[in-house]
C-alpha cells in the first residue's frame, strides 16, 4: 500500500477541526494568572494564562473585552469563559475568551479601585481644581432621575430653605448602560445654558451595580471639565463614588446637597435684619458726630464773624502774592546770573579756543623740529666731509699717484718683504693706472734702520 504524506497545513486543520467539534472544548471555564499581557492598538487583548504547572495562550477580541469593567494586568488572577481552537500559523492551541472577571475580588470593586488610583494620579481629585460653591445661587440645576425620591427631597428642601431660588431639573437615567452618557450630556447642556450657578448631580441609595454610572470615567471627566461648581449627592452617607472624589463638594445625601446649594432664607432674613440694625446704629452715630461738629463750627470765630475772616484772608492773599512776585524776580535774577556764568565758562572753554591754542603749539613744534633737523644735517655733512678727507689721505691710490705700487705674488697676496719671493717667481705690480706682470730676476736685500 502506497504511503500518503500529509502537509503541515492539512494536519493542523485536521487537529483544529477535531478540537472545534469537541463540545467539552467549546465552552470552557478556566482560572489562572495573567502574564505577557499586551493590549493591541485595535483593542484586542493577547496574554498567557498560567498556573504552577502549565500555561495556555489566550486571546480576547475587542468585541468581547469592551464589556469588562476592570483593566487586566500581569499577575492578576482571573476567571474566564471561552473556547479552545488552534492558531494555524504557529500550530499552537489557545483559548478565545468571551468573558472575564477577577478571581477573588468583585469585578466592579476592582474596576472602581483601578479607576480611582488612575484619576487620582492625574490630579482630578486635587483641591487645587475645586471650585467654590456660590453662597447665594440664583439658579440651581439638578441632574438626577425625574421619578426617584432624590428629586423630591432636593426640590422640597430648596423651596423650603430658599423659595426665591430657581430650580432647573435635567432628567437623566441614573442606572443601566445608558446612564453614564445621559449624565454626561446633561452636564454639558447645563454648562451651555450659561444661567446655572451650581449643579447637584446624584441619586438615591442602591447597590454598587445600581450606583455604577457615577463610577464611570466619562462621568468623572465631565464633572472635572464643568465650569459650573458641582455638588455630588450619590446614595447614602456611607456610599462613596468616583463622582464624589471629582466633584467640587460632596454631600452625604441628596437632601444635604440641597442644603449646601441653597441658603436658609430665614437665616438670611436674620442677617439682613442684623445688618440693617447695625447700619442704622452707625448712621445715627455718624449724624450725631456731624451735629456736634456743626455746633462747634457755629460757635467758632469764623462762623460768627465771616467778614473779618474774609478780610484777613484777603490780606494774607495779597501778601502771599507780593511774596510770590518777589520770589519770582529773585528766581529770575538767580537764573540770569547762572546763565552769564555758564556763558563765560563756555566761551573760555569753547572748542575753537582749544583748537587755536593747539594749532599754535603745533606750528611752534614744527619750526623747532625744522631748526633742529637743519642743525643735525649740517653737523652730519661736516663730519662726512672730514671722514672722506681722512679716507682719501689713506687711500692706496693716493699713494700710487706719488709713484708707489703694490706687488702681489701668484696667489694675489701682497708682498711685504723680498724674503717672500724667489728668483724666477711671477709677480704682478699694481700701479695707479694698471697692473704689470713681472718675473723676479734678481733679489737685493737691505737692512732696515728704524723702519727705513
Curated annotation (Swiss-Prot):
InterPro entries to which the protein is assigned, alphabetical: Exonuc_VII_L (IPR003753), Exonuc_VII_lsu_C (IPR020579), OB-fold_nuc-bd_dom (IPR025824)
Keyword hit for Kinase: no
Compartments in which it is found: Cytoplasm
BP term (GO), one: DNA catabolic process
Entry EC no(s): 3.1.11.6
Pfam families per UniProt: Exonuc_VII_L, tRNA_anti_2
Keywords from the named record: Cytoplasm, Exonuclease, Hydrolase, Nuclease
GO cellular component: cytoplasm; exodeoxyribonuclease VII complex
Chief location bin: cytoplasm
CDD domains: ExoVII_LU_OBF
Catalytic activity, reaction form: Exonucleolytic cleavage in either 5'- to 3'- or 3'- to 5'-direction to yield nucleoside 5'-phosphates
Disulfide bonds: none
UniProt-recorded Gene Ontology molecular function terms: exodeoxyribonuclease VII activity; nucleic acid binding
UniProt xrefs under HAMAP family: Exonuc_7_L
PANTHER family (alphabetical): EXODEOXYRIBONUCLEASE 7 LARGE SUBUNIT (PTHR30008:SF0)
Summary of the function given for this chain in its UniProt record: Bidirectionally degrades single-stranded DNA into large acid-insoluble oligonucleotides, which are then degraded further into small acid-soluble oligonucleotides.
Family: Belongs to the XseA family.
Quaternary structure and partners: Heterooligomer composed of large and small subunits.
Protein name: Exodeoxyribonuclease 7 large subunit
Organism (species): Bacillus cereus (strain ATCC 14579 / DSM 31 / CCUG 7414 / JCM 2152 / NBRC 15305 / NCIMB 9373 / NCTC 2599 / NRRL B-3711)
Gene name in the database record: xseA
Amino acid at each position: 500500500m502506497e504511503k500518503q504524506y500529509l502537509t503541515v497545513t492539512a494536519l493542523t486543520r485536521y487537529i483544529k477541526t477535531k478540537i472545534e467539534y469537541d463540545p467539552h472544548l467549546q465552552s470552557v471555564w478556566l482560572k489562572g494568572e495573567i502574564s505577557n499581557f499586551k493590549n493591541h492598538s485595535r483593542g484586542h487583548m493577547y496574554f498567557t494564562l498560567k498556573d504552577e504547572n502549565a500555561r495556555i495562550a489566550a486571546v480576547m477580541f475587542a468585541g468581547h473585552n469592551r464589556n469588562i469593567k476592570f483593566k487586566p494586568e500581569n499577575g492578576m488572577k482571573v476567571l474566564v469563559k471561552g473556547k479552545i481552537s488552534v492558531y494555524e500559523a504557529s500550530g499552537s492551541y489557545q483559548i478565545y475568551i468571551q468573558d472575564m472577571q477577577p478571581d477573588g475580588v468583585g469585578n466592579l470593586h476592582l474596576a472602581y479601585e483601578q479607576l480611582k488610583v488612575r484619576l487620582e494620579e492625574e490630579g482630578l481629585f486635587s483641591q487645587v481644581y475645586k471650585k467654590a460653591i456660590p453662597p447665594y445661587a440664583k439658579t440651581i440645576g439638578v441632574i438626577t432621575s425625574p421619578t426617584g425620591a432624590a428629586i423630591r427631597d432636593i426640590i422640597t428642601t430648596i423651596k423650603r430653605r430658599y423659595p426665591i431660588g430657581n430650580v432647573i431639573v435635567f432628567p437623566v437615567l441614573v442606572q443601566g448602560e445608558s446612564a453614564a452618557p445621559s449624565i454626561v450630556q446633561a452636564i454639558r447642556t447645563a454648562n451651555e445654558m450659561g444661567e446655572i450657578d451650581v449643579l447637584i448631580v446624584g441619586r438615591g441609595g442602591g447597590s454598587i451595580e445600581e450606583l455604577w454610572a457615577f463610577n464611570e470615567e466619562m462621568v468623572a471627566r465631565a464633572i472635572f471639565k464643568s465650569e459650573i461648581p458641582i455638588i455630588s449627592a450619590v446614595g447614602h452617607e456611607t456610599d462613596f463614588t468616583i463622582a464624589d472624589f471629582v466633584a467640587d463638594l460632596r454631600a452625604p445625601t441628596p437632601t444635604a446637597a440641597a442644603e449646601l446649594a441653597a441658603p436658609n432664607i430665614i437665616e438670611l432674613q436674620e442677617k439682613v435684619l442684623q445688618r440693617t440694625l447695625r447700619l442704622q446704629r452707625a448712621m445715627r452715630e455718624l449724624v450725631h458726630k456731624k451735629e456736634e461738629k456743626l455746633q462747634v463750627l457755629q460757635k467758632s470765630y469764623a462762623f460768627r464773624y465771616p467778614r473779618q475772616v474774609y478780610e484777613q484772608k484777603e490780606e494774607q492773599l495779597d501778601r502771599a502774592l507780593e511774596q510770590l512776585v518777589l520770589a519770582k524776580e529773585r528766581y529770575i535774577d538767580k537764573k540770569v546770573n547762572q546763565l552769564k556764568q555758564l556763558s563765560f565758562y563756555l566761551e573760555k572753554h569753547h572748542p575753537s579756543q582749544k583748537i587755536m591754542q593747539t594749532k599754535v603749539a603745533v606750528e611752534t613744534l614744527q619750526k623747532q623740529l625744522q631748526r633742529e633737523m637743519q642743525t643735525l644735517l649740517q653737523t652730519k655733512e661736516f663730519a662726512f666731509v672730514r671722514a672722506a678727507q681722512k679716507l682719501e689721505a689713506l687711500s692706496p691710490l693716493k699713494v700710487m699717484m706719488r709713484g708707489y705700487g703694490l706687488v702681489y705674488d701668484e696667489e694675489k697676496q701682497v708682498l711685504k718683504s723680498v724674503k717672500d719671493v724667489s728668483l724666477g717667481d711671477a709677480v704682478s705690480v699694481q700701479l695707479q693706472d694698471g697692473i704689470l706682470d713681472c718675473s723676479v730676476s734678481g733679489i737685493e736685500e737691505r737692512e732696515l734702520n728704524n723702519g727705513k
